[in-house]
């Protein structure tokens, strides 16, 4: 568990590309309430800090657009967004409450191939972002996290930088063209939860 000061520090330093794997319950439609950030209000959600699990880190590649509000990454309410599938896949699992971030910070790009192409031309940029990721883990006060990568590109970066240091799992990216039920089954199978 993290304390309030640590939560606020994480929110202040990393809130525009990080979040936590906690969402409001869905409503009548699967995407309902996925963008409801009131779940991160410590005053109204008094059990929030007990739900957070910084020992598990879910890692995407990079933001696809600017994040306007702290902790809004992975909580996109737009109709075309697929973040709701993460909520469905992790609900009532040991991965609910995990820390969520991107390995590449502040690089807005929707096409992962363009991101990976850029990294091939600028290794120092990747190194800088890996340093920031290490700083995030330090601020989370976690020495040996379980790391879960969303998709092959995030996994490739994590694997080449941390393969001898941490256990890294690769799950399909949530934007893949698959239904939420199938996505949950794939994630459950890889992460071995019921």
Describe the predicted segments one by one.
Residues 105-106, 152-156, 174-177:
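Short Gly/Pro-enriched loop/turn and capping motifs at secondary-structure junctions
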Residues 157-164:
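Short loop/helix-cap segments at secondary-structure boundaries that form the rim of catalytic
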Residues 91, 159, 176:
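Hydrophobic/aromatic-lined pockets within catalytic cores
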Residues 2-146, 156, 169:
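A polyanion-binding, active-site-adjacent surface
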């Amino acid at each position: 568990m993290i304390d309030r000061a640590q939560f606020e520090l994480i929110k202040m330093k990393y809130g525009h590309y990080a979040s936590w794997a906690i969402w409001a319950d869905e409503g009548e439609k699967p995407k309902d309430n996925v963008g409801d950030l009131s779940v991160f209000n410590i005053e109204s959600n008094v059990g929030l800090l007990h739900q957070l699990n910084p020992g598990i880190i879910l890692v995407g590649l990079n933001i696809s657009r600017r994040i306007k509000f702290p902790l809004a990454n992975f909580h996109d309410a737009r109709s075309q967004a697929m973040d709701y599938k993460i909520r469905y896949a992790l609900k009532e699992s040991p991965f609910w409450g995990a820390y969520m971030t991107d390995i590449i910070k502040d690089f807005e790009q929707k096409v992962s191939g363009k991101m990976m192409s850029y990294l091939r031309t600028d290794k120092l940029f990747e190194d800088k972002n890996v340093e920031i990721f290490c700083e995030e883990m330090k601020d989370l006060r976690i020495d040996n996290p379980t790391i879960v990568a969303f998709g092959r590109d995030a996994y490739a970066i994590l694997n080449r930088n941390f393969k001898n240091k941490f256990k890294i799992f690769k799950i399909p990216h949530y934007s893949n063209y698959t239904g939420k039920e199938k996505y949950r089954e794939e994630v459950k199978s890889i992460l071995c939860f019921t």
